[in-house]
């Protein structure tokens, strides 16, 4: 198999340029999307549910299991999962795989945790982070 630009099977080659000679690449095996830290921020949701998803600990901004992606380059980073168990959970959005830049409720830098409830196991939980307002919406279906 081979995947190219925008994660498309047999898609166009992906090319990158760097200004300082160092670049980190990120690949999502599930979506086949590739990006780099030079193309835009790496955004994750760090929260109380991460250990349930296979992260080594909760509240770990470096765990890529909840990597939000902006595949269409519109500034809105999203991820959907059915793996968060039923319950009430909290999270923040972390930028750059650390807590240095993070956004809580109402897009406030270093703001309070954002709470959400998953009503049943297997429900689809979608996170959407708007990089212009720093607000995150959570939809559970």
Give the role of each language-model region.
Residues 61, 138-141:
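Phox homology (PX) phosphoinositide-binding domain
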Residues 14-16, 23-27, 34-36, 114-118, ...:
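Fold-core signature of tandem repeat domains
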Residues 1-17, 38-86, 96-117:
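Aromatic-rich carbohydrate-binding modules that target alpha-glucans
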Residues 21, 85-87, 123:
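A glycine-anchored, Pro-Gly-centered beta-turn/N-cap motif
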Residues 29, 95-97, 131:
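Surface-exposed loop/turn motifs at beta-strand-loop junctions within extracellular Ig-like
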Residues 24-33, 48-50, 106:
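Extracellular/luminal beta-rich ligand-recognition
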């Amino acid at each position: 198999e081979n995947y190219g630009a925008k994660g498309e099977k047999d898609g166009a080659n992906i090319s990158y340029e760097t200004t300082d000679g160092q670049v980190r690449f990120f690949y999502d095996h599930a979506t086949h999307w590739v990006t780099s830290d030079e193309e835009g921020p790496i955004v994750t949701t760090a929260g109380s549910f991460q250990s349930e998803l296979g992260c080594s600990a909760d509240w770990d901004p470096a765990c890529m299991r909840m990597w939000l992606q902006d595949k269409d380059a519109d500034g809105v980073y999203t991820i959907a999962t059915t793996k968060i168990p039923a319950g009430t959970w909290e999270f923040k959005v972390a930028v750059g795989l650390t807590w240095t830049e993070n956004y809580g409720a109402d897009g406030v830098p270093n703001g309070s945790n954002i709470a959400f409830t998953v009503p049943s196991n297997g429900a689809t939980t979608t996170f959407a982070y708007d990089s212009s307002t720093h607000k995150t919406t959570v939809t559970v279906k």
